[in-house]
Amino acid sequence: MARPTKKSGPRKQKRNVPSGVAHIQSTFNNTIVSIADPAGEVISWASAGSSGFKGAKKGTPFAAQTAAEAAARRAIDQGMRQLEVMVSGPGSGRETAIRALQSAGLEITLIRDVTPIPHNGCRPPKRRRV
């Protein structure tokens, strides 16, 4: 029986994108960093989970720092130099992720908090009793 031929998908080509937008979504359980070009095409992304952290460790500031460094490294390989940062969510990794992007060698031009705030929308979850 003949072996099925392997189909190779579209190869990711190296683009030269000097500026872009970083979206940091920081929840209590995880931090996701996506870096896109000005048109909105995602160039690189990383999360605390994809950086090797599991369980409760994904919500830590160190995990957010590691994820931001990984995403920044891939974006710099594509030619990224300047970033606008959009931060969303209440998590503990917000500031750490921004600092990690800066220390990776990216110049941050703008930081904007885009956390959605309800005008008395859904009922919040019940208080934890430990």
From Swiss-Prot:
- Specify the species: Synechococcus elongatus (strain ATCC 33912 / PCC 7942 / FACHB-805)
Going by the UniProt record, its keywords in alphabetical order are: Ribonucleoprotein, Ribosomal protein, RNA-binding, rRNA-binding
User: Which PANTHER family does the record associate with it?
Assistant: 40S RIBOSOMAL PROTEIN S14/30S RIBOSOMAL PROTEIN S11
Q: Which GO terms describe its biological process?
A: translation
Signal sequence, renumbered to the chain = none
Q: InterPro entries of this UniProt entry?
A: Ribosomal_uS11, Ribosomal_uS11_bac-type, Ribosomal_uS11_CS, Ribosomal_uS11_sf
**Residue ranges, annotated region (Disordered):** 1-21
Family assignment?
Answer: Belongs to the universal ribosomal protein uS11 family.
Designated name of the protein: Small ribosomal subunit protein uS11
Q: What is the disulfide pattern of this chain? A: none
Question: GO CC terms for this protein?
Answer: ribonucleoprotein complex; ribosome
| NCBIfam families xref list | PRK05309.1 (NF003698), uS11_bact (TIGR03632)
Q: Which domain of life is it from?
A: Bacteria
Function text: Located on the platform of the 30S subunit, it bridges several disparate RNA helices of the 16S rRNA. Forms part of the Shine-Dalgarno cleft in the 70S ribosome.
Q: Locations of Basic residues compositional bias?
A: 1-15
Q: What SUPFAM superfamilies does its record include?
A: Translational machinery components
Its quaternary structure?
A: Part of the 30S ribosomal subunit. Interacts with proteins S7 and S18. Binds to IF-3.
Gene Ontology terms, MF aspect? rRNA binding; structural constituent of ribosome
